[in-house]
Amino acid sequence: ETGIRQADFTPVFENQIKQAIDEFAGDDISYAVRSSATAEDLPDASFAGQQETFLNVKGHSNILIKIKEVFASLYNDRAIAYRVHKGFDHSKIALSACVQRMIRSDLGSSGVMFSIDTETGFEGVVLITSGYGLGETIVQGSINPDEFYVSKKLLKDNKPAIISRSLGSKKIKMQFTGSSSDHDQAVQVVEVEEGQQRKFSIDDRHLLELARQALIIEEHYGKPMDMEWAYDGLEKKIYIVQARPETVQARLSGQTMERYQINTHGKLLISGAAIGHRIGSGQCKVVTSAQDMHMINEGDVLVTVMTDPDWEPIMKKASAIVTDSGGRTCHAAIIARELGVPAIVGCEKATEVLTDNQLVTVSCAEGEQGNVYEGELDYKLLETDIGDLPELPVRIMMNVGNPARAMSFAGIPNDGVGLARLEFIINNKIGIHPKALLAFDLLDNELKEKVSALTYAYPSPTEFYRQKIIEGISTIASVFDPKPVIVRCSDFKSNEYANLLGGELYEPHEENPMIGLRGTSRYLAEQFQDCFAMECQALKYVRDEMGLTNVWIMAPFVRTLQE
């Protein structure tokens, strides 16, 4: 590494670089200098973040310096450790430096996208993450980004194709400074104003444009792809700045279903986004600096703010990883998937809640939400060879309440969904009584503020309600299409509705809610008809506009002929 840094380029090489820059756009604009190695992204290795990237580099001499730094990074500690772990021959690795014009995403947004679901390997969607400013914050895992799923089939059919939107906190962004000679001074991290945090960092039009590009790139390479993108805030254009093969789900056979099952539940300490589907337990080691990495022993649970490529040698020692920040496409998530280590990212306060030597169990086996429990809990691994399952003389449909589990369930032999309940969507994705959304202008200021915090990114409170139901139903329906998906309309009891935000204002106290105002009788009740109308509008949109006519509708708890 030092030898490369101290060596001189030949005058011929230097002149060729200068000439290329002048022909391209001149040296008065800024460039990104990035690595592209032959061993990067082999079928079972992502090499995520192993070599250097430099942003906002200006001038011939600075570009040449950074090219040399990229070459030298082939032999930094983390790259050597990664190759040793993967069994690659150091002499068989070749590397080039890629010089790209800098996209002004510091004035726009940027992110990562996969043409496959990173957690389940379901190939029918494009997963897109997005944040403000330069994409480094997402790749490094220093923000919790916005996250979207786009259905490939609906996109190809020219139907509304965005089936899921999750708002990330996006508290910071990276932008350029005036300096361009030193990488550390060429960019700076600033806070994102609160109003922007509460909005999505990319609009639907650009999301769909990105998803179309993902399909083109996937078709070109003939395999699932991992891509980085940037939206130029000056040009108002989207650029794809990197594409490489996805390295984890694409190599799984899909014939053996591995399922971890937690048998007991302890006290829930903290939650975040689950990476993978495994469970791990051990003693916490709270590490806030790379200097303290030596504290991690085999089998410890690594707890940190975020990881970067320097952490890779110790990540494989950990039984599990828990971070304060980051999304499903950050460095920690990619490496954890590759190593088969359960990880929970974006917990916000893990380094405050968890303490050194505290015994915990980290579970990624309960859906999209990963949970950290107190103590060492009992769990088991169940393995099923799907290829060996017998043909059955009956149709087997499954229950899917949580849309986030639909993609993993779709891999199990099935004949569709016999019951998709709206209660999970209303409880977990909405959390607000529908009447409070309809009567938003009449709410007191305190309740208004709480409702606004949840609905701010949507055109109106009622549109938030409709949209979340549309997203939940369309996720399940598009994943199982063309098999039937029977959606049961809401069947909360009055005491359950009262637990939603604002619910106590609208719900009666009933001695026996089990046979009270629920199901179809509630839909017909004058005080609830406008609430039920929003459900109907959502169902109609999914069937008529999105074309998901595999959705069947079930009316629950029908007690009379009139109902």
Q: Which ranges hold each PLM region?
A:
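Conserved alpha/beta-domain cores
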Residues: I21, A37-F47, K92, D106, ...
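Extended active-site and interfacial segments that coordinate phosphate-rich ligands
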Residues: F47-A81, S105-S179, V241-A273, K317-D324, ...
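Conserved metal-phosphate-binding beta-hairpin within the catalytic cores
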Residues: G49, G222-T247
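Non-catalytic terminal/interface segments that mediate subunit docking, oligomerization
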Residues: T256-M306, L501-R518, R522, Q527-K540
